[in-house]
Amino acid sequence: MDRSINKAPLRTGAAFSLELDRDLVHVYGEPAFHYFLDIERARFIRSARPCVLLRVDLKDQHGIPARLPQTLSERLFLGIAKSVRDTDFIGWYEDERVAGVVLTEIAEKQPDESIRRTVDRMRRRFETLFPVTVSSRLDIRVNTIRDEGVRN
């Protein structure tokens, strides 16, 4: 898939904004999200620091990421936005299946602790936004991205 922002930056599943406590939350569509992810990856490589990507999806009964209906995805993105800094960016890592958030500022002294707190905050937020039948199936994966690709 060509993810060049010059060719089709915001096509189907494009960027959209959600109102969140009188603030607008910008959510990138898959092509734009990957474009900005590539920029962040290059920036982090130059600075010799890892780029942290959180991927969130809803597992079906077989453990496979399920397609998220619009009502669920909107609440998912609102929950993510309430859990991260406004300098982090969120969007579709994989359209309608996997949400992504890039943590652009990680505490340098204790990066693992900073990431753990963010994930815990996100889980608690999801528990308030969704019934247990949904929140228990939301999977949050932490990935460190380096020049060679995604590392689990």
Model-predicted regions and their roles:
Residues 63-72, 101-119:
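Short helix/loop segment flanking the catalytic signature motif in cyclic-nucleotide metabolism enzymes
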Residues 9-30:
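Amphipathic HAMP/coiled-coil signal-transducing linker helices
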Residues 36-58, 63-64:
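Active-site-proximal structural segments of metal-dependent nucleotidyl cyclase/transferase enzymes
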Residues 1-9, 117-124, 137, 146-148:
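Regulatory sensory/coupling modules that transmit signals to nucleotide-handling catalytic cores
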Residues 76-84, 115-130:
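Alpha-helical scaffold within the catalytic cores of cyclic-nucleotide enzymes
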Residues 41-46, 76-108:
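Conserved helix-loop-beta segment at the catalytic/binding core of cyclic-nucleotide signaling proteins
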Residues 19-22, 55-70, 84:
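Active-site loop/short helix in cyclic nucleotide turnover domains
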Residues 91-107, 128-152:
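A short glycine-enriched loop-to-beta-strand structural element that forms part of the catalytic core
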